[in-house]
C-alpha cells in the first residue's frame, strides 16, 4: 500500500489531461478460433523510442477458450472518494475476464516489462459466489472492483438474470452480488455512475 495517493489518480478530468503521456500501453491478444490461449501484450507507445509500436512483453494465459473482451484496473481515481477508505491503493493490477469461459485473470503490471499472472479466479467460484456468468466489463469503483456480466446461472448462462458483482480490490476475493433490488430487469450489459450524485445507470443487451 502507498503512503500517499497513487499519482495516476486524478481528482478531475482536467488534471488527468495535463498528466504526462503514457509510454507503454496494454492490449489483449485473441485466438479467433480458440486454438491458442489468449494473452496480454505490452506495447511501446513512446514516439521517441526505437521500439515504438512494437510488442515489448507478452503474458500468455494457461488456458484456451477464454475469449478476452474488456478489461480494467483494480483501482482508479474513484478510490479518492472520501467514503471509500481506499485512497492509498495502487493502480497495479489488470483484471481480465474471459467472456466465454467465465474465468478471471489478475495480472500484476507494476513492472510492465515483467508483467505476470498474480491470481486466477476459476469460473466455478464466480458461479458459486454470484449466480452470474460471462463477466463482461471491469470498473474500478469506490467500494471495490465492479464486474458486469452477460450471463446468469446455469450451463448456458440463461438460468436467471445476469447483473453486477463486486470483488475486493486488494485480495481479489469475490464479495457477492451488488444488486439488492433489480426490479423487472432480466438482462444486463454495462453501467456507469455519477459518484458525486450517488447514482448508477445500467443497461440491458442480451443473453450469451
Task: Describe the residue ranges of each PLM region.
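Asp-box/WD-like beta-propeller blade repeats and closely related beta-sheet repeat scaffolds
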Residues: 108-195
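Beta-strand C-termini and the immediately following turn/loop, strongest in propeller blades
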Residues: 29-32, 97-98, 148-152, 204-205
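Beta-propeller domains
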Residues: 2-5, 16-89, 95-122, 157-159, ...
Amino acid at each position: 500500500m502507498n503512503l500517499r495517493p497513487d499519482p495516476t489518480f486524478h481528482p478531475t478530468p482536467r488534471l488527468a489531461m495535463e498528466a504526462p503521456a503514457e509510454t507503454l500501453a496494454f492490449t489483449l491478444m485473441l485466438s479467433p478460433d480458440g486454438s491458442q490461449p489468449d494473452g496480454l501484450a505490452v506495447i511501446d507507445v513512446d514516439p521517441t523510442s526505437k521500439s515504438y509500436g512494437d510488442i515489448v512483453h507478452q503474458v500468455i494465459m494457461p488456458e484456451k477458450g477464454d475469449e478476452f473482451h474488456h478489461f480494467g484496473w483494480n483501482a482508479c481515481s474513484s478510490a479518492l472518494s472520501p467514503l471509500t477508505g481506499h485512497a492509498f491503493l495502487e493502480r497495479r493490477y489488470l483484471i481480465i475476464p474471459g467472456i466465454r469461459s467465465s474465468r478471471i485473470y489478475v495480472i500484476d503490471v507494476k513492472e510492465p516489462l515483467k508483467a505476470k499472472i498474480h491470481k486466477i479466479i476459476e469460473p466455478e467460484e464466480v458461479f458459486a459466489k454470484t449466480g452470474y456468468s460471462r463477466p463482461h466489463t471491469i470498473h474500478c469503483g469506490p467500494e471495490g472492483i465492479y464486474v458486469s456480466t452477460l450471463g446468469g446461472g446455469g450451463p448456458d448462462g440463461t438460468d436467471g438474470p445476469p447483473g453486477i458483482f463486486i470483488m475486493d480490490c486488494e485480495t481479489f476475493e469475490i464479495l457477492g452480488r451488488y444488486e439488492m433490488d433489480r426490479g423487472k430487469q432480466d438482462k444486463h450489459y454495462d453501467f456507469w455512475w455519477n459518484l458525486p450524485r450517488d447514482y448508477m445507470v445500467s443497461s440491458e443487451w442480451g443473453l450469451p
